């Protein structure tokens, strides 16, 4: 009887060790996910800045076109 009881106790200890290992793996996975999220946020910010710059350039081009049109009108008046 005594021998059988000892064997059962050893098996239970082994099971506990396995559970601990699984918990450690889960923690590592969570850390990796957090890092990925941070990287994505940084990329989004950069993209927004680039878009703003492009919009400013377009506005400048439009202003230049308007100036050219005014010059053409003045020339026509002089010819008349």
From Swiss-Prot:
Coiled coil: none annotated. Keywords: Neurodegeneration, Nucleus, Spinocerebellar ataxia. Its main location: nucleus. Disulfide bonds: none annotated. It is found in: Nucleus. GO terms for cellular component: nucleus. Specifically found in brains from SCA8 patients (at protein level). It is unknown whether this protein exists in non-SCA8 individuals. It is linked to Spinocerebellar ataxia 8: Spinocerebellar ataxia is a clinically and genetically heterogeneous group of cerebellar disorders. Patients show progressive incoordination of gait and often poor coordination of hands, speech and eye movements, due to degeneration of the cerebellum with variable involvement of the brainstem and spinal cord. SCA8 is an autosomal dominant cerebellar ataxia (ADCA). It is caused by expansion of a CAG repeat in ATXN8, which is translated into a nearly pure polyglutamine protein which forms 1C2-positive inclusions in Purkinje cells and other neurons. This is Ataxin-8. It comes from Homo sapiens (Human). The gene is ATXN8.
